[in-house]
């Protein structure tokens, strides 16, 4: 066990980790174009935060959380999702008093004790955003548009948007009663989990993946059928802005998401080609969550995109994201060359170059072989003859062409290419 990673976790090595870096870089770029700033919260919180925020009757709270007592006897939970922690930080720091709306993004690991499979791990990573302080339908549409823009940036152009409105607490009063009556008559056909949900959270039955439950739910009342006038108008406006932006979507009346805090707009991003875990992200509005966690009655909306599932979708589509390679491999031949080259390499790195070298005193042939294995763009050769002449060989490893340069000419060349005048 000492050398085995825990079940449901992954180790990332190059070049795989370069793909993650590129995805996170592009997500940050998109977030900043839309005016979002990064927030970082602890990976563990007081358990009560998730019980109240996510909902005590959700699958996450009931059976998927990593919860333990710390040495002071306090119940602590590794975060199973990002929204509740962001809201807690927002309320604790009284950021709600600042001119709004507040716009945050986050990138990081989440933890759920779930059955590991492709696209579903016990430690997984999310790219998320939250915008707090606005109930405008245009904000809902912009948040959705932002996620789709990120997918477009990384090459996922055929992501399907599924859209619904789950209404407000007032809407759901009548819906809850109708759902209980409907499913009570068909209770024996429900799975055991949905039987338990029936009187506690009947809305979740609409989202059950059990085939029998799905068949029964086809004719059940849905949130869309019970929307109050305000929620209906809000949903109409959200769709209007999506239409103006020429965003394609599918209305899914059974989409309710897995968290209790959602109100009004709910959405998911789906790539059917990746199989059972076809949902690669989703989100929605949560207008009561800030108040529930102890803040003022402010609205909010956000999304979380699964990083592992996004990468799985990219790989299934054979989309390639460029992997960085060294700019230069410096071949140092002999101790004198090593002493001369050591500070030179540092100077080159200060020009923002990725520079590799040999540390073991290998032959020129072996060093050039190492440079090619790393796919370095060029090799700089410094040996006894080069030190005597003061001119070093710079070889393009793609074309084989080479030139002789002095130290100053070498620095000037790379400074010019990097847009720096360090000559």
Swiss-Prot record:
GO cellular component, one term: cytoplasm
Keyword terms: Aminoacyl-tRNA synthetase, ATP-binding, Cytoplasm, Ligase, Nucleotide-binding, Protein biosynthesis
GO biological process, one term: histidyl-tRNA aminoacylation
Keyword Protein biosynthesis tagged: yes
Reactions catalysed according to its record: tRNA(His) + L-histidine + ATP = L-histidyl-tRNA(His) + AMP + diphosphate + H(+)
Pfam families reported for this sequence: HGTP_anticodon, tRNA-synt_His
Subcellular locations according to the entry: Cytoplasm
Listed NCBIfam families: hisS
Family listed: Belongs to the class-II aminoacyl-tRNA synthetase family.
Designated name of the protein: Histidine--tRNA ligase
Organism: Carboxydothermus hydrogenoformans (strain ATCC BAA-161 / DSM 6008 / Z-2901)
Gene: hisS
């Amino acid at each position: 066990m000492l050398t085995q990673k825990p079940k449901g976790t992954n180790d990332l090595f190059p070049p795989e980790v370069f793909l993650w870096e590129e995805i996170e870089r592009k997500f940050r770029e998109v977030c900043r174009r839309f005016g979002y700033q990064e927030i970082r919260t602890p990976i563990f919180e007081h358990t009560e935060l998730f019980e109240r925020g996510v909902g005590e009757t959700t699958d996450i709270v009931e059976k998927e959380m990593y919860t333990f007592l710390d040495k002071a006897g306090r119940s602590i939970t590794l975060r199973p999702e990002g929204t509740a922690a962001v809201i807690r930080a927002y309320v604790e720091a009284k950021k709600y008093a600042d001119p709004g709306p507040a716009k945050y993004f986050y990138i990081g690991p989440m933890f759920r004790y779930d059955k590991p499979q492709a696209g579903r791990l016990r430690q997984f990573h999310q790219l998320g955003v939250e915008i707090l302080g606005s109930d405008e339908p245009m904000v809902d549409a912009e948040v959705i548009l932002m996620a789709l823009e990120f997918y477009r940036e990384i090459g996922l152009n055929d992501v399907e948007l599924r859209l619904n409105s789950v209404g407000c607490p007032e809407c759901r009063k009548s819906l809850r009663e109708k759902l209980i009556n409907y499913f009570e008559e068909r209770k024996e056909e429900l799975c055991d989990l949905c039987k338990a949900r029936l009187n506690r959270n009947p809305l979740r039955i609409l989202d059950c993946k059990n085939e029998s439950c799905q068949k029964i739910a086809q004719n059940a009342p849905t949130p869309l059928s019970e929307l109050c006038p305000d929620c209906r108008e809000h949903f109409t406006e959200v769709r209007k802005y999506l239409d103006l932006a020429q965003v394609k979507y599918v209305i899914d009346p059974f989409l309710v998401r897995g968290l209790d805090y959602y109100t009004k707009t709910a959405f998911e991003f789906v790539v059917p080609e990746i199989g059972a875990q076809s949902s690669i992200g989703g989100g929605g509005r949560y207008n009561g969550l800030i108040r529930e966690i102890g803040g003022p009655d402010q609205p909010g909306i956000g999304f979380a995109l699964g990083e592992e599932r996004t990468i799985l979708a990219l790989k299934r589509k054979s989309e390639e994201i460029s992997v960085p390679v060294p700019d230069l491999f410096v071949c140092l031949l002999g101790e004198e060359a090593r002493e001369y080259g050591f500070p030179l390499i540092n100077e080159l790195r200060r020009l923002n170059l990725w520079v590799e070298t040999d540390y073991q005193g290998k032959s020129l042939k072996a060093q050039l072989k190492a440079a090619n294995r790393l796919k370095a763009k060029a090799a700089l050769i410094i040996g006894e003859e080069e030190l005597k002449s003061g001119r070093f060989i710079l070889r393009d490893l793609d074309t084989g062409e080479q030139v002789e340069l002095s130290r100053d000419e070498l620095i000037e060349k790379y400074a010019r290419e990097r847009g720096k005048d360090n000559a």
